[in-house]
Amino acid sequence: MRGVFIAGVIAAFAITVVDSLNCTQCYTYNSTCDGQATECNEQSFSCVESSINSTLGGFLHVYQNKFCSASNCTENSTEVAFTVHLFDDQRYHFASQCCQGESCNATHSESGTQNVTDMQCMSCYGHNKTLCEEKPQKCYEGEQCVFIIAEMVNGSGRVELKGCSDISNSTCQFLSPGNTTVGEFVFKSVECTQPTEYTNSTTTIPPITNTSLTSVTRPGIKTSPASVTPQASMGTKASFTSSIFGSLLLLKLLF
């Protein structure tokens, strides 16, 4: 009988060890997010890592958030990572990973040296109701055209992206149904198409229309009514870019 009791205690201890979840936890903006994996509370079932590396507006912005999550990953490991290239050498790199049973691996790196082709996608970016002025962007080898509308989980900020992307076909299929949540982000709409032969043209498409959304600004920063033109000054450009990231970071849209 004593042997049975001891075996039961060992089994219970083993279950406790298996059920414990350790995740790296840190949050940074424009700095490195490093931290040791620590044990999560009992309500957490997954580790989540999200990051954005962007040069929209001509300024570098880096955002990272690693945390324990009460959400269950749809698979043992769900990872989405891709870069969107836009006009004027602007880019938006998005990465998010949800893991169960272990801390996420830091494998979100952008592609190295690439060869430019004579194929193109129309590119632009917009925030909430701002205009998205399309311009042609030459693509690198292996890229396809994307049209992405994404927002943070709480709906406080929305971003629209068009351009050339290294997004994989499997990721396109995973996100294309719409309203797909990955980490802190909800991909409202994702379209992937093949690029066309390069031509130099510019068009303006209507702004994002969603009357239920309200403008979100960072405390202490005044923003004028959004109107983006190619002749906008660098000051206006910086204000517009800060507005984009200000609303994104209020959650805690590459992607």
Curated annotation (Swiss-Prot):
Glycans are attached at N22, N30, N53, N72, N76, N105, N115, N128, N154, N169, N179, N200, N210. GO terms for biological process: defense response to Gram-negative bacterium. Residues 121-170 form the UPAR/Ly6 domain. Residues 1-20 form the signal peptide. CDD domains: TFP_LU_ECD_LYPD8_rpt1, TFP_LU_ECD_LYPD8_rpt2. A lipid is attached at S233 (GPI-anchor amidated serine). Its main location: membrane. Keywords: Cell membrane, Glycoprotein, GPI-anchor, Lipoprotein, Membrane, Secreted, Signal. Residues 234-255 form a propeptide. Secreted protein specifically required to prevent invasion of Gram-negative bacteria in the inner mucus layer of the colon epithelium, a portion of the large intestine which is free of commensal microbiota. Prevents invasion of flagellated microbiota by binding to the flagellum of bacteria, such as P.mirabilis, thereby inhibiting bacterial motility in the intestinal lumen. Segregation of intestinal bacteria and epithelial cells in the colon is required to preserve intestinal homeostasis. This is Ly6/PLAUR domain-containing protein 8.
